[in-house]
Amino acid sequence: MGNLNETPSANRLHIGIYGKTNSGKSSLINAVTKQEVSIVADVAGTTTDPVYKPMEIHPLGPCVIIDTAGFDDDSELGERRVEKTHLAAEKTDIAVVVLDIAEVIAAKKAGVPFKKAFKDEAEWSLLFAKKHTPVVFALNKIDEILLSAEAQEKSSGKLDNAAIEAAKCWVYEENSAVMGKNADNSFEVVAVSALKGKGMDAVISALTRLLPEDFGQEFILGDLVSQTDLVLLVMPQDIQAPKGRLILPQVQTLR
């Protein structure tokens, strides 16, 4: 692999981070990259326009991390920010959708369907499925759940992380239902604490598994045509070429 600075942005893996305002998107980016890439604040709507940050993440290689505005931004400029987020989705190779795990556990306990409790996330999940964009659901803020579990441990003598695992399973099953006929789209669910830096290896492993098999492959026609396009190829002929011997342009055309 060449120097990171020599890799054109268009050839890098674009990883888009999506979620509600204050779900921990920017904190997750900083934790995964181990850099202060994004501004983190308790004020909702800190991230406005999408921020594109080129970097290298092992073992994914050269990437572009896209930090987006919350898709529930109801501020004065919120609608325009969400439009910019939709534009970022067009460039995304793998999406990471961040959810607050406490909200997930509460919805599961109350028996509220995912598509109702997380209407925006469900709509974006379906959007990515239709685009065949793999998705990683990151259930964030497990540190708060673990603190609660530690309090229970002191009284019961047992630390139980079952709520976190149950939340992951619930999101996976519910999201499969949301996708419907698009359920074959690849997605995974991980539990993390962006604040404490926990679960980052799980995020990177999920991204690695979801990396499209043909990503980074160079084709003779580049991105000029897609798989199902109808193309007319014109091959030059060389009457002086030996019988049965293909000249280079013919070889390239057949490839």
List each language-model region with its residue ranges:
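P-loop NTPase nucleotide-binding/switch module
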Residues: 1-13, 138, 144-145, 214
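Conserved G1/Walker A P-loop phosphate-binding module
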Residues: 2-79, 83-90
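Conserved beta-strand elements of the Class I
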Residues: 16, 97, 230-232
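Conserved GTPase G-domain signal focused on the G5
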Residues: 24, 143-145, 159, 163, ...
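Short, flexible loop segments at the rims of nucleotide/cofactor-binding pockets, characterized by
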Residues: 42, 72-77, 104-106, 111-116, ...
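Conserved nucleotide-binding/hydrolysis micro-motifs of P-loop NTPases
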Residues: 45-46, 70-72, 101-105, 141-146, ...
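Conserved C-terminal guanine-recognition region of P-loop GTPase G domains, centered on the G4
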Residues: 56-61, 80-189, 219-223, 245-255
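C-terminal accessory "lid"/substrate-recognition subdomains
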Residues: 209-228, 232-255
